[in-house]
Amino acid sequence: LTLLLIGIIRLILPAALINPGDYVLMTTPGYPVFGTHAKYYGGLVHEMPLLERKRFLPDLKAVPAEVLERAKVMVLNYPNNPTGASATPEFFEKVVAFAKEHRLVVIHDAAYAALIFRGQPLSFLSTPGAMDVGLELHSASKMFNMTGWRCGFVVGNPLLVKAYGDVKDNTDSGQFLAIQHAVAEGLENPSFTKRIVSKYSRRMTGLVRLLKGLGFKARKPGGSFFLYTASPRAAVSADGSRVEFPTAEAASQWLITEKLISTVPWDDAGAYLRFSVTFAASSVAEEKEVLEEIERRLSDVKFEF
């Protein structure tokens, strides 16, 4: 079953699913809104860290038994924000088995599913048994560069979609029809998204190259428009002056105040910075200029990691 939605699904779903005392299993770092709203309804959040050595996939076996006894929902997001990591069919198979064993609802936030640089998009619902336990959320905002227009759809287990729809019917009155027509046009013309993916892939390749040249251990992700890389511990200027970064937050603040380069810091599961390739540039030449400017601003210091 599929239901069209506007951009408030993560706010509505907790109202449909969470009772006081229920646990939500959330990945960290990650987009926290579902967990935040679950708390409004008396829910609790258990964080599952995403570690580089585990390919930024959560360790399901590490969830404590006392949490699983009260767990109701597990929220996943692949390709992942902020890590850019992609899930595998084998991982999703483990998720389905885990959800059935512990009677969990799986919400897979697939906002970036179409933005992949290799292979074909992977839907959680393509996993055998996933329709028994899950929902998948899709975002036209990311798929067609329609951020701010707030349109997408939810698909999955009919009972879960109905539960969402019952709350949604009393929450909003639907999206502006012209935006719905625009989304339909995009869905009927996948070449739109292919061009967007090609642009992001090209920019990501350039960003990875320049950051590696500056000492970052940057690697091109499997998808999304985010580049997640270990934060530097210090920056040393040509005159020998040194700035220490005890946290990713400190490094991010230095980058924006001293170099006018915006990043998002994460200190939840190691110190990392999230770069993005959504900068404004209307041509390949302008993209090159932006990347060269980033390199110029950072080339007068040596980063230590």
Model regions: which residues?
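PLP-dependent class I/II
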Residues: L1-F305
